[in-house]
C-alpha cells in the first residue's frame, strides 16, 4: 500500500474533522443582532450577556473551518460593533470583559481584561486556556506555569486525552522542534505536559493564535526567520516560515483536512503526527517504530476521533513492517491493537 495514496484515502477523511463544530451556528438561531437606527446609533434593548458573547464568538470563528480566513473588513467591523454594544450595555460583566480581551488580543491590555473577566465569573476554570495562551505569548512564565498546572489538575482534560498527547510528544524525536496544533484535544494538553514529559525545548504553535500579530512575531523569532506578510491564513504563514528554517516542524491530525491534503507532498506520518521535514523511508520506519515502542495506554482510548488517529498510524506501521521479520513481534502487537480499536469502532474500517 502506497503511503501517499493512503493519506488521500477515506481514513484521512475520518481522522481530520473540521476545526469547529458546525452545530455552533444552529445555537445562534433566533438570536438576532439589534438593528441600527438611521443615524447608526446602537439600540441597546434587552441585551443578553450570554447571547451577545455567543454572537461575538460565532462572528469571530465563522470561517475558521475554511483555513481560519476570517479577518476581513466586514468581520472586523461586525466584531467592533458587538464589542461596543458590550461595553455600553453590559458594563462590568464577565461577558463584556471577555469580549474586550478577545478584541485586544494577546497584549498587556488584553491580559488585564482577562483578569477582570476572571473576577466576574464563578466558573474560573473556563478561562485557564485563555490565561495559558495569553501568558505564553507575553512570555509571562510564572503565570503560564500557574495556569497550565491549574488546567492539568482541573479534570477538564480527561486521562485518555492526556495519554494521547503523551504519545504525540513521544512521536517527536527532535526535542528542539515545533508542533502545529489546532484544537482543545491537543494544544492545551500538550502545553501542560511539556515539563512533565521533559520536552520543554518543544514549541507548540496553535494555528488560531497566529491570527494575533504579536504571536506571529514571537514564533518567527523562535524559528529564527523573518516575519513574512500575513494574508489572513495562518497555514500559508506557517508553510512560508517553514521554508526558511532548519527546525523540525510537525503537524497534528487535528488540522483541517484541506490543509493536510494541500501539504501532503511535504508530510510524512511519524507516530501520530506528520513531519514537515523530508525523511527517507528507512528513517521514517526507524522513527515510527521508536515512537510506537514508547506509546502508553493505547487501550484507554475510547474517543472515536483519537481512535481514528491511532488506526491511521497502525496502518502506516503495518505497511512499514510487513516485510521485516526482525519486527514481527511489533507488527503482531500493532495488528492486535488495531483489531481491538476497529472492533470498538467498526465505522472506522
Which role does the model predict for each range below?
Residues 1-28:
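Bacterial Sec-dependent N-terminal signal peptides
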Amino acid at each position: 500500500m502506497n503511503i501517499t495514496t493512503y493519506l488521500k484515502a477515506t481514513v484521512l477523511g475520518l481522522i481530520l474533522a473540521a476545526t469547529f463544530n458546525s452545530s455552533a451556528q444552529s445555537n445562534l438561531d433566533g438570536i438576532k443582532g439589534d438593528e441600527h437606527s438611521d443615524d447608526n446609533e446602537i439600540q441597546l434593548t434587552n441585551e443578553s450577556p450570554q447571547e451577545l458573547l455567543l454572537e461575538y464568538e460565532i462572528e469571530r470563528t465563522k470561517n475558521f473551518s475554511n483555513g481560519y480566513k476570517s479577518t476581513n473588513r466586514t468581520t472586523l467591523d461586525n466584531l467592533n460593533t458587538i464589542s461596543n454594544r458590550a461595553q455600553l450595555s453590559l458594563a462590568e460583566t464577565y461577558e463584556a470583559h471577555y469580549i474586550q480581551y478577545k478584541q485586544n488580543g494577546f497584549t498587556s491590555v488584553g491580559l488585564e481584561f482577562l483578569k477582570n473577566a476572571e473576577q466576574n465569573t464563578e466558573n474560573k476554570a473556563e478561562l485557564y486556556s485563555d490565561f495559558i495562551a495569553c501568558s505564553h505569548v507575553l512570555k509571562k512564565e510564572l503565570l503560564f506555569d500557574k495556569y497550565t498546572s491549574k488546567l492539568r489538575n482541573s479534570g477538564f482534560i480527561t486521562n485518555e486525552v492526556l495519554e494521547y498527547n503523551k504519545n504525540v510528544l513521544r512521536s517527536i524525536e527532535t526535542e528542539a522542534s515545533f508542533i502545529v496544533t489546532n484544537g482543545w484535544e491537543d494544544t492545551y494538553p500538550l502545553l501542560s505536559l511539556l515539563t512533565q514529559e521533559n520536552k520543554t525545548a518543544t514549541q507548540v504553535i496553535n494555528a488560531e493564535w497566529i491570527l494575533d500579530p504579536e504571536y506571529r512575531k514571537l514564533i518567527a523569532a523562535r524559528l529564527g526567520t523573518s516575519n513574512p506578510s500575513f494574508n489572513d491564513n495562518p497555514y500559508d504563514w506557517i508553510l512560508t516560515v517553514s521554508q526558511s528554517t532548519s527546525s523540525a516542524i510537525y503537524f497534528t491530525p487535528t488540522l483541517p483536512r484541506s490543509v493536510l491534503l494541500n501539504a501532503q507532498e511535504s508530510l510524512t506520518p511519524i507516530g501520530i503526527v506528520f513531519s514537515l521535514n523530508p525523511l527517507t523511508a528507512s528513517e521514517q520506519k526507524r522513527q515510527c517504530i521508536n515512537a510506537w515502542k514508547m506509546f502508553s495506554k493505547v487501550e484507554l482510548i475510547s474517543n472515536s476521533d483519537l481512535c481514528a488517529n491511532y488506526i491511521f498510524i497502525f496502518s502506516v506501521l503495518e505497511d512499514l513492517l510487513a516485510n521485516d521479520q526482525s519486527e514481527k513481534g511489533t507488527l503482531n502487537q500493532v495488528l492486535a491493537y488495531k483489531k481491538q480499536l476497529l472492533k470498538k469502532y467498526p465505522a472506522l474500517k
